[in-house]
Amino acid sequence: MNDYNNVLVGFSELIKNEEYRPYDGNLRLGVDLGTANIVVSVVDSNNTPIAGASYPSTVVKDGIVVDFLGASRAVAMMKGKLEEMMGVEFYEAATAIPPGIISGNVKVISNVVESVGLDVINVIDEPTAAASVLGITDGAVVDVGGGTTGISILKNGEVVFTADEPTGGTHMTLVLAGSLGCSFEEAERIKKDPKQEMLVFPVVKPVIEKMAAIVKRFIEGYDVDVIYVVGGACSFKKFESVFEKETGVKTIKPAEPLLVTPLGIAMNCKKQ
């Protein structure tokens, strides 16, 4: 198991068990306003995960905050819960955006975080945040979220290209709902149930193939040897094999793909 996989599994356990690790020095806070989940992450000055909280959410759609009050309340609740558990107060945070988002939407995302008394000291794009966790200097990071799929291409540790496409887990759910003749909410529940994966995956596979075809187009000319896929929508067991077949490029999915970007946001909670 790669080091980052051990880190991600440990971080997941902290969230599930509502625990925190002993720490020394300064803490860094990251707030990820996702389409399906809001995740708040805490790391120490060595980027070791210390604590975290996750909350299912529908306050963001395609990288745009559609329920400001709901988002603010959720972040305030999670921040308060972590502060009470750890006996600390947080004053600064980093947050993240899909690549290519317009500046007005960036401001709204920052405003949500600042509405709970946090000073936003860094806004990073989501795939680049994920690259921080994975320790990538060369390759492509594809962040498959609920509403959008973002890609960053890195060369020698520098981001040389970013893009965002409006397709993601929500589109899988819509296809599934149409196929099963059920509501969006029911399809979302079925999609997230690991026991239903044999039923679900053949239905959503064309959506994954479309995502991979888009990524293949973006990486042409960049000599990409490996693609890392992260985000909750890539949790299917065969996701990376479909991606690899479609792109012709080795594709790796870390453990706990939903938590990669949120953890990377906390790691980048430092003044730029």
Describe these PLM feature segments.
Residues 150-152:
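A structural feature that tracks compact, well-ordered secondary-structure segments
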Residues 155:
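A cytosolic small-molecule/anion-sensing beta-strand core signal
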Residues 147:
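Short glycine-rich anion-binding loops that position phosphate/pyrophosphate groups of nucleotides
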Residues 1-35, 39-144, 158-272:
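Nucleotide/phosphate-binding catalytic cleft detector across ATP-hydrolyzing
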